[in-house]
A protein has these predicted regions:
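Surface loop/turn signatures of beta-propeller and other carbohydrate-active proteins
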Residues: 1-23, 41-42, 57-88, 103, ...
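Loop/turn-rich, solvent-exposed surfaces of beta-rich toroidal or solenoidal domains
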Residues: 235-273
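Short beta-strand-plus-loop segments that form exposed binding edges in beta-rich domains
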Residues: 513-518
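Extracellular carbohydrate recognition and processing domains
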Residues: 474-507
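Beta-propeller blade signature
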Residues: 48-54, 114-120, 201-208, 263-268, ...
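Asp-box/WD-like beta-propeller blade repeats and closely related beta-sheet repeat scaffolds
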Residues: 104-151, 162-181
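Conserved small/polar residues in nucleotide/adenosyl-binding loops
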Residues: 519-526
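Short beta-strands within extracellular/lumenal beta-sheet-rich domains
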Residues: 394-422, 431-440, 444-449, 495-499
């Protein structure tokens, strides 16, 4: 079988969200923040870069740790580096832009933009300084967060910012939101109210060729007020990224929906943007009219960008694991930019960067499922859910889908099916001996969905036999079945192989497993094995 690649496209023990892909020479480099597997907060690890030949996206190579949080002067008061970007300067060197933050994001809105430099795209970066004014004063105008960098034919542009809708509330000055901004942003009320438009929103600053010094004052690229504009339903939240397609500027960002990457288009880099649409949602919300209530995954933060690699455009984004926003994995999909500049929303898939569907012959990790839902999946927030629902998780080096319940749908898109095949799954029933129990610190987020309601919706009986229905459409009829019998001869920690012969259609299709029972079931790393 030829080498393939699937989502997530990096090793399954790697968690690099907030992806910024860049092609330099004959390789594409993937930059991002770095989550810890099963971590208790965002971005707990040092920056690691992966790269691949532009002509072989199945072959990703780890370039190692390229920069450590301890190299920044804010460390250890602020321990973590958030979403970065890298740009090639006019001197041929590579410049890394990032912001520091603490546990749960505290301090992430209060600091400056830091800069590091390296002679190569993925070598060892060295701290250079902060973005500053000509007199050496550190630039902290607006909210320095999620910086993105662009060398626009010799002009160095940095895009950054975040946006909440507080200031469009009619009673903003009296409802307590101003106090919230003071706390979040580390500014006085007078400083916040002193901005002509708003302290929030997507911002652009132009730098001198030294890559540090402000050349043109920071300014909004999209007005803060979104009501009665094209951005009203999908306002900017965070995750700025800019690309140039032909003579148009494409601003890619994470919206207030907090599960989708959107784009806006302009003839200019600093004004004139019109909302274009959603590129991808990590719950497929909006794709072919899908509602948020009918999302196909736990949704949550996303951040990424688009890049043309060997003539094909892709969108890079991330998915959530471990029932939180703290262990996010890089994924990618092909996209198509129409002649009129429009980008249709794409669905999340398992095949991702693969040049076509996955071969229906071999063993695949269960955790490459692109759809995982029990019909009432939660939306992530700045916390970890402790109630039970289907999720991708790990125990040591074992990575699997846990807490599968009656009606859970597990989807894989797409396979090149070739008719009748043996289809099998590696499974075990969940017990106290093998259950994943989170034992780290737990932060309560008021935005987190009601855990008691989720618990009631996921109240399951245990030790009941079940089976997987096999389907090729989300709501279609079963074309096969794999029974998962209970056996006292098998230890609670042992995985069991169950299989059956299935008459698949001879064409490209999704494969869905739907569990039938009220038991907990875990699907092992090698959940599916399709053999012609």
């Amino acid at each position: 079988m030829n080498r393939q690649v699937y989502n997530p496209f990096l090793p399954l023990n790697e968690y690099i969200p907030d992806g910024e892909p860049h092609v330099w020479g004959d390789r594409v480099y993937h930059y991002g923040s770095h989550d810890k597997e099963g971590g208790y907060t965002f971005c707990m690890q040092d920056y690691v870069v992966y790269s691949a030949p532009v002509k072989d996206l199945t072959s990703w190579r780890c370039e190692g740790i390229t920069y450590r949080a301890s190299q920044d002067p804010a460390y250890p008061e602020l321990k973590y580096m958030y979403a970065p970007d890298v740009v090639r300067g006019n001197d041929g060197r590579y410049y890394l832009y990032y912001c520091m933050g603490g546990d749960y994001g505290y301090g992430g809105y209060t600091g400056p933009i830091s800069v590091a430099v390296c002679d190569t795209p993925a070598g060892k970066y060295e701290y250079l300084g902060h973005v500053q004014y000509k007199d050496g004063t550190v630039m902290k105008k607006y909210i320095c967060f999620d910086p993105a960098a662009m060398n626009d034919d010799g002009t160095i542009r940095i895009f950054y910012g975040t946006q909440y809708g507080y200031e469009e509330e009619p009673d903003f000055l009296t409802n307590g939101r101003l106090d919230d901004e003071v706390s979040m942003f580390g500014r006085t009320k007078e400083e916040i109210l002193g901005y002509k438009d708003s302290i929030m929103g997507p911002i652009m600053v132009v730098l001198e060729d030294d890559m540090l010094t402000v050349k043109e004052e920071p300014r909004h690229i999209i007005p803060y007020a979104v009501k009665e504009t094209s951005f009203e339903k999908h306002p900017f939240f965070e995750g700025s990224s800019m690309r140039k397609v032909g003579d148009k500027y494409y601003f890619v960002y994470s919206s207030w929906q907090n599960h989708e990457l959107c784009y806006a288009v302009s003839d200019y880099p600093d004004h004139g943007f019109t909302f274009g649409g959603t590129i991808v949602s990590n719950g497929d919300v909006g794709y072919k009219g899908r509602s948020f209530e009918n999302k196909l995954n736990m949704t949550g933060t996303t951040h990424g960008s688009i890049e043309c690699i060997d003539g094909q455009w892709y969108v890079f984004y991330h998915r959530l694991t471990h029932k939180s926003d703290y262990s996010r994995q890089a994924c990618a999909e092909k996209i198509y930019i129409a002649a009129d500049g429009h980008i249709d929303q794409v669905e999340v898939t398992s095949c991702g960067l693969n040049d076509g569907p996955l071969v229906a012959n071999g063993t695949y990790p269960a955790v490459i499922a692109c759809n995982l839902t029990n019909g009432h999946m939660p939306h992530g927030s700045n916390s970890i859910y402790t109630t039970e629902f289907p999720n991708v998780t790990n125990k040591g080096e074992d990575r699997f889908i846990a807490e599968i319940e009656d009606g859970t749908l597990i989807g894989y898109k797409y396979f090149a099916l070739e008719g009748s095949s043996t289809f099998g799954v590696n499974v075990r029933y969940e017990t106290d001996a093998n259950k994943v129990v989170y034992e780290g610190p737990v932060r309560v987020d008021e935005r987190c969905e009601n855990q008691e309601q989720l618990k009631d919706a996921n109240d399951l009986a245990e030790n009941v036999e079940g089976y997987f229905d096999i389907c090729v459409t989300e709501d279609g009829e079963s074309i096969g079945r794999i029974d998962i019998p209970v056996s006292e001869d098998i230890s609670e920690t042992e995985w069991r192989w169950c299989e059956n012969r299935v008459d698949f259609p001879e064409r490209v299709h999704a494969v869905y497993l739907v569990f039938v029972s009220y038991t907990h079931l875990r699907a092992h790393e090698t959940l599916s094995d399709l053999v012609c």
